[in-house]
Amino acid sequence: MEKLLIVNADDFGLCKGQNYGIIDAFRNGVVSSTTAMMNSVDINHATELSAQYPALPVGMHFVLTFGRPLTAMPSLTDANGELGKWLWQRAGAGTLDLNEIAQELECQFERFSAVFGRPPTHIDSHHHVHMLPQIYPLVAAFAREKSLPLRIDRHEVQQHGLTLDNPRSSEWFNAGFYGENLSEPSFLQLLEHADQQGVNSLEIMCHPAFIDQTLMTSGYCYPRLTELAILTSPTLKPAIAQRGYRLGSFLDC
């Protein structure tokens, strides 16, 4: 039986270099899905590219740790009105305002539908914040209400003791294609690991990009260019097929 592989490029809309990299990896490589950051400065550029390449499925990358929120979020923003990674401190202290988060989720979803002209194919999140135990039930209920698939990290489920209510998702998710020591063999090892789990659908996260001034300020910069080179390698797609996988998206879940 042919297995489903979703190669999802996160951070669509982050900057033009990221946007162009994702499109290149879709057109000339194995990226088969992407997720858009609705509060990013170059989201309109992403929507223009999406209109040029409508075959690329686009989901929503829910953001609570970067940029400015679309709604008032005094409990999660600093003096400059910016979101940040201090969300984990607030979560650990039990001070997250779930009403604020729910309103921001709804607003990001509504903006997605407005600018892309359709609902997202699925939902995931920046820095995997939707897998935090306080936030997951809220996002899972929202996805269920909207009849949308959701990225599920089974390691986070086990770590936090989360209860899954049969969400639409891939059977396995792997965030391992990330970091300094990336290669085509390391990508293919993720498929082999999924086979060891006995699953028939796998999502792999990636961040292919061309480097621009925005990404030069990111803590994860040059590996994005390495990702792009690997994901557009002419030998990768045949190697994926040889292992019994077909490329697809959350529309296939």
From Swiss-Prot:
Keywords, sorted A to Z: Carbohydrate metabolism, Chitin degradation, Cytoplasm, Hydrolase, Magnesium, Metal-binding, Polysaccharide degradation
Catalytic activity: N,N'-diacetylchitobiose + H2O = N-acetyl-beta-D-glucosaminyl-(1->4)-D-glucosamine + acetate; diacetylchitobiose-6'-phosphate + H2O = N'-monoacetylchitobiose-6'-phosphate + acetate
EC number: 3.5.1.105
A single GO cellular-component term on record: cytoplasm
Annotated positions binding Mg(2+): H61, H126
Broad EC category: hydrolase
Superkingdom of source: Bacteria
Cofactor dependence: Mg(2+)
InterPro entries: COD_ChbG_bac, Glyco_hydro/deAcase_b/a-brl, YdjC-like
Pfam families, per database record: YdjC (PF04794)
A biological process from GO: polysaccharide catabolic process
Compartments in which it is found: Cytoplasm
Similarity comment: family membership: Belongs to the YdjC deacetylase family. ChbG subfamily.
PANTHER family with a match to the protein in the record: CARBOHYDRATE DEACETYLASE, YDJC DEACETYLASE FAMILY MEMBER
Quaternary structure note: Homodimer.
Function: Involved in the degradation of chitin. ChbG is essential for growth on the acetylated chitooligosaccharides chitobiose and chitotriose but is dispensable for growth on cellobiose and chitosan dimer, the deacetylated form of chitobiose. Deacetylation of chitobiose-6-P and chitotriose-6-P is necessary for both the activation of the chb promoter by the regulatory protein ChbR and the hydrolysis of phosphorylated beta-glucosides by the phospho-beta-glucosidase ChbF.
NCBIfam families in alphabetical order: PRK02134.1
Protein name (database record): Chitooligosaccharide deacetylase
Taxon lineage: Bacteria, Pseudomonadati, Pseudomonadota, Gammaproteobacteria, Enterobacterales
